[in-house]
C-alpha cells in the first residue's frame, strides 16, 4: 500500500466517506456490458444455484437450479446460461476494421507487413466480486471439455453445442482477467477499490454493499456505520437485509428458507414422477417459490452492481485506457480466430514455454499499467513522487551542451528546483512526456546548490565557473562554482533542492534540438525514474526447443492433458 493510499484511508475514516484515489477512470467500461451475478450451493463445490444475467439493468434474466444435486438440472442451467451469454459474445465478432501489422514470412523468415482483421469492439463481462471471477474460471473449466452429439454420437450425456463453446470463452476471459489492466472480465469490487479508498481493510472491500456504503453513504450516515449495516444488519426473521454479493449464500437464508423450499420441491417432484394427482401443480408452485427466494438474494446485488457502474461512469476515462482496451480487442479477435479455425479447447495445463510467456506478458502489462496510470492521473503521479519514483519542479536554468562524438548531438543540462525527494543515483535514467505525447529520456547528473542555481551572485549558477558543467562530473567531486557531482553531498536534503538533468533523447536527429523539445526557464516539468513504455524480455524458445531443465520438448505420444483421470462411476453423476 502506497503512502498516499494510506493517507486517503485515514482521511476516509476522519470524514466518514471514501476518498478518491484517482482523478480519472483507469479501466474501460463498455457502453453495453453484460452483468453476471452468480450464486453457488453451500456444501456442493462449484454447484450453481442461480444467476442473474443480461445487458439491461431493468430486465435481467433469472436462471435457477431448483435442485443443485441433480446433474440433469445443472446441465440444463449451463445450457440456458450458454443461450444467454454466447449470443452476446458472438455479436461483436463480425464488425471488424483492418489493421497493418508485421508477421514473419514462413518462406523468407523476414518480417513483412500484412493486413489483418481487428474487431471494432469486444464484449465485456461484469461480476460483483473477485469470487465471481473465480467462479467464471470454474465454469469455463467445467464446460469446455463437454462432448456434444456431433463430436461423439455415443456420449451418454451430450451437451448442446453452445455449452463447450461458452466454456472456451469463459476460460479465455478468466485467463485474460489475470493480465493487469485487462477489461474483458471485471470485478466491480476491485474496480471500485482502485478508484476510492475506504476506511476499512482490503478484505472488507470485497463486500460490495459495504464498499458502496463507504463511497456513497446515505444522507447523514457516516460510511463506517452504513458499511456495518450493509454487512450485518438483519430483519425480524434473522436474514441479512443486504445479501452477500455471491457466489456464496447467507447460512441463515440456507437453513431457514432455502433448505425447506428444496425439500418441498423434492417431495413434489417425487410425487409427480409417481403420477400423484395434483403433484404437477405443487411442483410448479415449489419451483416458483424457489425462483422467488433465489431472486431475493440476487436482485439487491444486481442493483448494487449497476449503481457501482454509474459511480464509475461519473469519472472521465484516462487518456491511455483506449490503448489497453485495444489489446483486449486483439485478444478477443485472436480467440475468435482460434474458435473459427476449429482448434481444440485450451489444455488443462500449460507447457513450460506457454506458462513462461504468460508470466512475462503479465509482468510487462503490470509495468505498463503502473506507468500509464501515473501519466494519466496527477493524483497517482503524486503517489509515485511520494515514493521517490518521480519528481516535479520548475526549470531554473538551461545550459546548452553537446556530446563529444564525431557528430555532436545536443545534450542540454537542465536545472530543476523541486520539493520532492527522488531516489537518485549517478547516471540514473529519467523519462518525461513532451507536449506532443512523445517520451524524452535524460539522466541524472548531480545536485546543484539552490543559491548558486538561482544565480544569487548575478550570474546563472548552472553556467557559472564550475557550475552545472562541473556537476556533470561522475566522480562525485564538487565543482568550484558550488554544484556537487552525483556522488557528492549536494543539497539533497534541504528544502527546495535543485537537480541537474542531462537530456539524452527526444530532440530530433539534428545538431540543434527540435523546437519544444528542450524546456525553457520557468517551465514546470515532471521526470520519472520508471519507463513510460516498458518492454518484455527476450523471446522464449518454441515448445519443441524446451530445455531439459524444464521438462524438455512435449512428447507427442504422451497424454495431451496430463495423466488419465480415474474411470467414471455412478457416484460421479449424483
Label the model's feature ranges.
Residues 384-458, 490-503:
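Secondary-structure-rich domain cores
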Residues 453-492:
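Long, intrinsically disordered low-complexity tandem-repeat segments
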Residues 37-42, 67, 127-130, 419, ...:
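Structural motif
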Residues 116-124, 128-251:
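Metal-dependent DNA phosphodiester-chemistry modules and their immediately adjacent helices/loops
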Residues 7-10, 280-423:
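Accessory interdomain/linker segments of ATP-dependent helicases and helicase-like nucleic-acid enzymes
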Residues 426, 432-435, 441, 451-454, ...:
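C-terminal effector modules of nucleic-acid-centric enzymes and ribosome-associated factors
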Residues 189-295, 299-322:
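Long, charge-rich alpha-helical interaction segments
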Residues 1-122, 142-176, 180-181, 185-188, ...:
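Long, charged/polar, low-complexity intrinsically disordered N-terminal extensions
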